[in-house]
Amino acid sequence: MFKSINREINQIINRGFDRTLRLAVTGLSRSGKTAFITSLINQLLHINQEGNAHLPLFEAARNQSILAVKRVPQQDLSIPRFDYEANLNDLMNNPPQWCQSTRGVSETRLAIRFERQSGLLRHFKERGTLYLDIFDYPGEWLLDLPLLNLDFQQWSLEQANITSGVRQQFAQDWLDKLKKLDLSAVVNEDVLAQIAKSYTDYLLACKAEGMQFIQPGRFVLPGELEGAPVLQFFPLLHLSEEQWQKLKRETKSNSYFAVLNKRYDYYRNKVVKGFYENYFSTFDRQVILADCLTPLNHSQQAFIDMQTGLNQ
């Protein structure tokens, strides 16, 4: 992981000229994203200040191609700034403590000033600057990207297939309410919100038990969408194919069934696709961290659940 970042920086320095590299770091909750980014920034800022013994495998530091590294203002002022100072203080406290969990997207920018041997003149050295934009975002949002290829029925079927064992136990309260709901009836916003809250409580219980394949990811880390109707829907696990087709043919646009479909489509096309277009598709490189020990400490099902999430 760190080796691949080093290799990328080395290649840019060898090519010369100024350039920007957009690096995203993500992972599921408590995988160490914030601590990793804080450490990476700290290591780069101390190049040429500590004899570079702290980065023995980083060729650009070892051969002193990197002249200096400093933090500079980010270009996109609408994205929250990664709080490097506060996170570093957490790690350096006595005793140390873990950094605050990632709740949304944040960014920081480093300017890496370097020089390299010119390919034209033996004693002439070229200088340039690599701007390293580092993004931190919740891995739970990454797990939503497969929804772009699934309609509401397909997603509901996928969720039905994984709702077993511990998940089935946690889902019971929500499923009881779902089975009593007349999907063809005119929607009541309050009832819909209550059942959606039960579904969210189910997802949070799964997360607390070490499950990591959580969809929709914004339900457990809503960010600026907390309380919005777009986060008030849920899969229909109990319907047969025949029931799906009948509801599609016969229900009106103001029915529970139609509104659930509409909200899922809005979430997929606006929230998930918006994240993909505005952030994910713009990253040059991505580091994904995974905490394998926590699921193992919980149960075999939690570990399998993590594998399912990583394979999406």
Identify the meaning behind each predicted range:
Residues 23-25:
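Hydrophobic anchor at the beta1->P-loop junction of P-loop NTPases
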Residues 28:
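P-loop (Walker A) phosphate-binding loop of NTP-binding proteins
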Residues 5-9, 17, 43-312:
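Switch- and interface-adjacent substructures of P-loop NTPase systems
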Residues 20:
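Short coil/loop residues immediately preceding or within conserved phosphate-binding loops
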Residues 36-37:
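Post-Walker A alpha-helix
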Residues 31-33:
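Conserved glycine(s) of the Walker
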